[in-house]
Amino acid sequence: MPCPKILKQCKSDEDCCRGWKCFGFSIKDKMCISR
């Protein structure tokens, strides 16, 4: 699955593309980021 160019909301790293991290300071506002 290709990585989306936009940051998408997530709950865990599994929601993100491979090699991306689920990051955020609040539980409701976590986003996928590329390392």
UniProtKB/Swiss-Prot annotation:
<comment type="function">
    <text>Neurotoxin.</text>
</comment>
<feature type="disulfide bond">
    <location>
        <begin position="16"/>
        <end position="32"/>
    </location>
</feature>
<keyword id="KW-0722">Serine protease inhibitor</keyword>
<feature type="site" description="Reactive bond">
    <location>
        <begin position="5"/>
        <end position="6"/>
    </location>
</feature>
<keyword id="KW-0646">Protease inhibitor</keyword>
<dbReference type="InterPro" id="IPR011052">
    <property type="entry name" value="Proteinase_amylase_inhib_sf"/>
</dbReference>
<dbReference type="InterPro" id="IPR000737">
    <property type="entry name" value="Prot_inh_squash"/>
</dbReference>
<keyword id="KW-0800">Toxin</keyword>
<dbReference type="GO" id="GO:0004867">
    <property type="term" value="F:serine-type endopeptidase inhibitor activity"/>
</dbReference>
<feature type="disulfide bond">
    <location>
        <begin position="3"/>
        <end position="17"/>
    </location>
</feature>
<keyword id="KW-0960">Knottin</keyword>
<dbReference type="GO" id="GO:0005576">
    <property type="term" value="C:extracellular region"/>
</dbReference>
<keyword id="KW-1015">Disulfide bond</keyword>
<keyword id="KW-0964">Secreted</keyword>
<feature type="disulfide bond">
    <location>
        <begin position="10"/>
        <end position="22"/>
    </location>
</feature>
<comment type="similarity">
    <text>Belongs to the protease inhibitor I7 (squash-type serine protease inhibitor) family.</text>
</comment>
<protein>
    <recommendedName>
        <fullName>U14-ctenitoxin-Pn1a</fullName>
    </recommendedName>
</protein>
<dbReference type="Pfam" id="PF00299">
    <property type="entry name" value="Squash"/>
</dbReference>
<dbReference type="GO" id="GO:0090729">
    <property type="term" value="F:toxin activity"/>
</dbReference>
<keyword id="KW-0528">Neurotoxin</keyword>
